[in-house]
Amino acid sequence: MSLRNKLYEQIASDGNRIRLRFNPSHPIFAGHFPSNPIVPGACLVQIAEEILSERLNRPIRFTTISNLKFHQPITPDMEVVYQLNENKIEIANPDLTAVYAQFKATYLCTDPDVQ
């Protein structure tokens, strides 16, 4: 199930940088956490997978994730930039002066018809 246009929307794209905003009224924030909502880490990783799949124009799934670090919580009212470099993904503020999360990932194409 895609999170795009439900939990987040893409608002700009510039090469390997994708800017997005979250939907603060999404039901996930009622439970994570009710009085102090933050974007779940699993969702941040899934969004990266969706963005990369769209960029490659083929379905993929991450097979390994390493060096996953959350430096600062991301709240639903924040805009963030996903920066994709080789196998490293960073989630930062729009002017790229603060990195909120980062990880390395390897992936596999999940479409058996794609070589």
Label the predicted regions.
Residues R61-T63, N67-A98:
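Hydrophobic beta-sheet segments that form the core/acyl-binding groove
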Residues S2-V39:
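Catalytic strand-loop segment that frames the active site of acyl-thioester-processing enzymes
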